[in-house]
């Protein structure tokens, strides 16, 4: 699968990363239309790739503001109707911190999204102050181990222990586990030995445009694994 990344081509400051403008979008209320724009754009590309025979899923990060919005699940349902992409091929990622900011609302929203068939992932797992009493109620399919634990796990024993424990916890809960921030073959091999389900990071690829991704999928050994049989 792939994850949607949004950048802002600012007329004065050039290409801005999300951490430069997402907080502003949240403060001004622009995060809602921005999220819907990203969802439509991501699903449009996913639809095209799937029609070309590439069995891809699409992940989109959502804000705490989205997860607290009672209208959000309905909006997602309407957007899904616009594209020939199975709901299970859309994965919405939310951080632990976002869930715990309004846990009751978050649980209710996630239940409605799950009822649509959309998959939910907890992003940056291990960096927030989550309550297991709420996490066990969330109908999540996946947890993503934050890159701060993964990138140096080959050299840092504590990081390695945290990653191993998180993989075991996720699997014991029946969840898939993804490691973020994989930059070397050594780390990839260690994750594989732990039975980690998936990984993402510069070892696989740097961020790509939609056109660049299409070419990468056709040429890279990683991309060829997504081709439909």
Feature locations, PLM:
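Catalytic-site/binding-pocket detector for metal-dependent nucleotidyl cyclases
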Residues: 29-30
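Catalytic core regions of nucleotide second-messenger enzymes
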Residues: 14, 50-56, 84
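Conserved functional hotspot residues or short segments at active or partner-binding sites
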Residues: 109
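EAL-family c-di-GMP phosphodiesterase catalytic domain
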Residues: 3-13, 22, 39, 46, ...
